């Protein structure tokens, strides 16, 4: 796991690579090329995990010297790619060497063969093309700027300030407050984009004018139709889960496991222990004792003791909440509305004191219907089938109810367009709320922005959604949108800030393809989620852990916001950039009434993170 950087037709600035040194403290490299009239630079910061010798240093050349790569990530199946190659003279055993030689012989369409997490750039000198690609679920981020025949790309945003003026985009900021994150390809900056999950960008350098083409290298899977005898499916699920964890134990350095009080990380830890020849440490974060009815650390401790694994925990209270949040937001570089980012910072710091690599249980809730909100999809299924029910719902008056999850369900339920319904189902701010918050033309301006963003979302997904049924497509979209651009994004940034690689076994290609092929009844009922997941988990874990009530990661956010209310208001309302976009009086109303709004805390954190980013 590393940091990558590159540019075309810019003079390379060494300080830009230094700005991501935390992603790769074990080494660095820069290579310059001349392709026709274009000046190309590939740069790299290295975190040594597989083949820690100099044979793994980057940028790395293919055996014949034609292709060069700068690579961030892991290819877990790289050994299975070697028999498909003519090249055999490997200097080491790194997946980077496999990758650069594989694509020196194969086409970029063969990206679908890679099972791993990655963001990389490959320069093919013979073809005069630069390829920049991101893994299919977006575990590893890549940002880029392409304008006026110039390109910059990087694992993080901070290098861009060495090359371009960074201008905030009002519409993208508004979108963040609507959806709680800014989804790829957009960022809060006008000219900086994110490569989308499962996307490859090709820059053709054969002519004076660089030509960019974008394509998705993964076809939409067949989803939600597979049915057969339950026991055989549980067995197959278990085999794929075990295979996924075993693959991701690939490392020449010590590996640990992030352990919460939930089933997902517990199952990953249990299988990892079973498959690993080396002892594993587990890591947990929690808050001061007595703060919540349930204690994350105590629950994780029970799991670790059951599995006979060492557990290292840290308790935090974030007394200096604002100062800590300033550090966190500068690391993450994007606006955030998820309070769990705050304890994740402490967990990342703790983990770095012991290991370079950790496995996490992230990625289960979306494909396996683990979130409470997915129960509502069962009702939406009936509304889609019987249109008169949707018409009747419009007459109920539910729209006027103050409970936010009811409002979101209503907005989605009465919407006949599935992609529009998806956005409403996942929003943290209604159109009316945004209309009040935006300055200048208010509601009319908001309506224009939201319609434009909705149109772009449809353009992105219309041809790729697997079904017009919400119960199939909503989890599919969550996995490739909110998971990639929110949870996975900030986990990568925080872990890599402390030079730790975080792996996600549940997002293994083969495992997800199997999960998504299943009929939803194997995953969700009115009373249960993750059904097949829990059935397999019973082979490794006691029922008390498998069926422990899902509580999510609780944070004392309400206490933080009360304690620091005036300081938060001062930070947000004194921001000149915030004042250009939002109505300050409306922001003060959000701050004063957040306890009556189910999404009030998310809105405050989003606005606060924006203000801190814009300082």
Q: Could you tell me what each predicted segment is?
A:
Residues 1-332, 344, 348, 538-539, ...:
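Cysteine-centered catalytic environments shared across enzyme families
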Residues 8-11, 126-133, 139-151, 220-451, ...:
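ATP-dependent adenylate-handling active sites, centered on carboxylate activation for C-N bond formation
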Residues 36-38, 88-94, 167-168, 232, ...:
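Structural motif
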Residues 90-91, 502-507, 578-580:
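A Lys/Arg-rich helix-loop hairpin that forms a DNA/phosphate-binding surface
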Residues 483:
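Phosphate/pyrophosphate-binding loops and the adjoining catalytic core of nucleotide-dependent enzymes
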Residues 541-597:
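PAPS-dependent sulfotransferase catalytic core
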């Amino acid at each position: 796991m590393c940091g990558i950087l590159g540019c075309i037709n810019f003079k390379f600035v060494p300080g830009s690579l230094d700005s991501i040194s935390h992603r790769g403290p074990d080494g660095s490299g820069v290579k310059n090329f001349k392709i026709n009239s274009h000046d190309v630079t590939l740069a790299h910061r290295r975190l040594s995990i597989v083949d820690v010798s100099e044979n793994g240093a980057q940028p790395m050349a293919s055996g014949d010297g034609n292709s060069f790569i700068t690579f961030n990530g892991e290819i877990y199946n790289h050994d299975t790619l070697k028999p498909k190659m003519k090249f055999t003279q490997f200097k080491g055993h790194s997946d980077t060497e496999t990758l650069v030689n594989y694509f020196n012989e194969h086409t970029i369409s063969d990206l679908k063969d890679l099972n791993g997490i990655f963001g990389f750039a490959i320069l093919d000198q013979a073809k005069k093309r630069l390829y920049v690609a991101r893994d299919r679920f977006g575990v590893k981020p890549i940002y880029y700027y392409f304008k006026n025949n110039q390109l910059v790309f990087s694992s993080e945003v901070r290098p861009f300030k060495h090359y371009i003026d960074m201008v905030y985009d009002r519409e993208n900021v508004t979108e963040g407050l609507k959806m709680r994150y800014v989804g790829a390809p957009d960022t809060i900056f006008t000219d900086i984009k994110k490569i989308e999950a499962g996307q490859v960008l090709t820059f053709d350098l054969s002519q004076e004018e660089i030509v960019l083409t974008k394509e998705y290298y993964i076809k939409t899977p067949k989803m939600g139709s597979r049915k057969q005898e339950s026991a055989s499916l549980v067995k197959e699920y278990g085999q794929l889960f075990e295979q996924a964890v075993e693959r991701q134990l690939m490392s020449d350095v010590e590996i640990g496991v992030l352990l919460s009080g939930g089933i997902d990380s517990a199952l990953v830890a249990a299988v990892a222990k079973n498959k690993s020849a080396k002892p594993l440490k587990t890591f947990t974060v929690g808050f001061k004792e007595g703060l919540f009815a349930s204690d994350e650390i105590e629950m994780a401790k029970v799991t670790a003791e059951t599995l006979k694994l060492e557990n290292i925990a840290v308790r935090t209270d974030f007394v200096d909440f604002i100062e800590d949040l300033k550090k966190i937001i500068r690391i993450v570089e994007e606006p955030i509305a998820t309070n769990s980012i705050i304890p994740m910072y402490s967990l990342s710091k703790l983990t770095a004191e012991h290991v370079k690599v950790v496995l996490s249980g992230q990625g289960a809730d979306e494909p396996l219907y683990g979130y409470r909100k997915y129960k509502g999809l069962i009702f939406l299924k009936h509304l889609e089938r019987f249109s008169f029910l949707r018409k009747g719902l419009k007459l109920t008056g539910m729209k006027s109810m103050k409970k936010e999850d009811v409002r979101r369900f209503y907005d989605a339920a009465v919407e006949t367009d599935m992609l529009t319904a998806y956005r409403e189902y996942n929003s943290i701010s209604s159109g009316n709320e945004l209309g009040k918050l935006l300055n200048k033309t208010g509601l009319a301006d908001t309506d224009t922005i939201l319609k434009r963003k909705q149109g772009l979302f449809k353009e992105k997904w219309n041809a790729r959604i697997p079904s017009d049924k919400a119960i199939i497509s909503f989890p599919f979209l969550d996995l490739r949108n909110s998971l990639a651009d929110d949870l996975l994004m900030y986990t990568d940034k925080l872990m890599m800030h402390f030079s730790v690689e975080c792996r996600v076994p549940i997002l293994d290609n083969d495992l997800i393809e199997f999960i998504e092929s299943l009929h939803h009844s194997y995953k969700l009922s009115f009373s249960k989620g993750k059904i097949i997941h829990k059935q397999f988990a019973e082979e490794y874990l006691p029922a008390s852990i498998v069926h422990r009530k899902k509580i999510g990661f609780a944070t004392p956010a309400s206490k933080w916001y009360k304690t620091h209310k005036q300081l938060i208001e001062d930070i947000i309302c004194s921001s000149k950039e915030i004042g250009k976009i939002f109505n300050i009086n409306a922001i003060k109303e959000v701050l004063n009434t957040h306890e009556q709004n189910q999404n009030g805390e998310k809105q405050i954190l989003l606005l606060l993170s924006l203000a801190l980013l814009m300082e």
